[in-house]
Each structure stands twice: as C-alpha cells, then as structure tokens.
Amino acid sequence: MKRIVLLRLGHRPERDKRITTHVGLTARMLGAEGMLLASDDQGIVHSLEDVVRRWGGDFYIKNNVNFKQEIRAWKEEGGKVCHLSMYGVNLPDVTGELKKCKKLMIVVGAEKVPPEIYQLANWNVAVGSQPHSEVAAVAITMDRIAEGEPLEKEFPGAELTIVPAERGKHVIENIRE
C-alpha cells in the first residue's frame, strides 16, 4: 500500500487559512495519510481534525513542524519527496516514477518556498508550468498517481456518510457505539 503525506510550507495564518485547509481536505480525500504543517496554526489543526471526526478516516495533522527535519527523516526511512510548483519537470514525465513510490511526501508551498526545497526534493514537478492553486496541484498529482479509486474510498468511523444521488443531498448519520 502506498503511503502519502503532504508537507505544507509557507502557510501564513492570517492569509492562507482557507487554502491550507482545502489543501489538507483534498489530500485527505485523495488518499494521503496526513499533513505536516510547517507553521503554527491551531485553527487549521482543529478544522481538519473536526472533518476527520465527522467524516471518518485516519488522517492526521502535525502542526509547526521543521520542514528540513521532516524531509530528512522521511528520506532516511526510504521515502521520496515530490515538490509541486509551476517550475520543474512536467508532471506527465514523472507520473510513472511517482506511481512506483511506496512512500511519498508531496510538498506544496504558499509563499515563495525556501531555495533548499529544490535540492531536498527527489523531484521538482511542474503542474502545468503556469500559475495555479496549490489545491489544484495536489488534486491533479494525487489523482494521476492514485492506486485504486480514491473517489470511491470509504472512510471508516464516519459520523456522516453521503449517499450518491442524481439530485438533492442525501446524508446518513451513522450510529457510533
């Protein structure tokens, strides 16, 4: 089974809370096991933990991490690092290699990322070679490298479950014991 974790760099609490939350939500939905936040923002932690509590799964978030230490530890444990931006090799050119990774850290920045990220990453990947959203970069990349069908994944322990329907909103409240 593939392990994917997301590392979020450069989060600015007053400016980026919504986009960082959406990056985490997208990573969770598409199969990441957790998010490492290289900033201190308890609001993001609480928002994502609340989603996991209500909608299920085992997604975790670590707040205020040292990105260099996290990357080094990940690589020492045999993991690979993929930095997503609008610079680097084109995503279609490395999709096959990324699919083979059993342990992958996906790095996305908010503001200008520290230059050493380009050296620490195994791949610097351009998602479209045009300005874009971090949410889009994570979604496109994770969809391209997905094992199975993450859009059909069930999240264990959910309090709420959406029932697919052609029209309307159908939500089941699950009983927990």
Swiss-Prot record:
> Where does the chain bind S-adenosyl-L-methionine?
L84, G109, A110, E111, K112, V113
User: From the Swiss-Prot or TrEMBL record, what is one GO molecular function term?
Assistant: tRNA (cytidine(56)-2'-O)-methyltransferase activity
Q: Which domain of life is it from?
A: Archaea
From the UniProt record, list the reaction(s) this protein catalyses. Answer: cytidine(56) in tRNA + S-adenosyl-L-methionine = 2'-O-methylcytidine(56) in tRNA + S-adenosyl-L-homocysteine + H(+)
User: GO terms for CC?
Assistant: cytoplasm
Look up keyword Protein transport and say if it applies: no
CDD domains cross-referenced by the UniProt entry:
aTrm56-like (cd18083)
Q: Where in the cell is it found?
A: Cytoplasm
EC number(s) per entry = 2.1.1.206
**Keywords, alphabetical:** Cytoplasm, Methyltransferase, S-adenosyl-L-methionine, Transferase, tRNA processing
Q: Report the record's Gene Ontology biological process terms.
A: tRNA nucleoside ribose methylation
- Give the quaternary structure: Homodimer.
Family note: Belongs to the aTrm56 family.
* Record HAMAP family: tRNA_methyltr_aTrm56 (MF_00077)
Please describe what this protein does: Specifically catalyzes the AdoMet-dependent 2'-O-ribose methylation of cytidine at position 56 in tRNAs.
What's this protein's name? Answer: tRNA (cytidine(56)-2'-O)-methyltransferase
State the organism of origin: Methanosarcina acetivorans (strain ATCC 35395 / DSM 2834 / JCM 12185 / C2A)
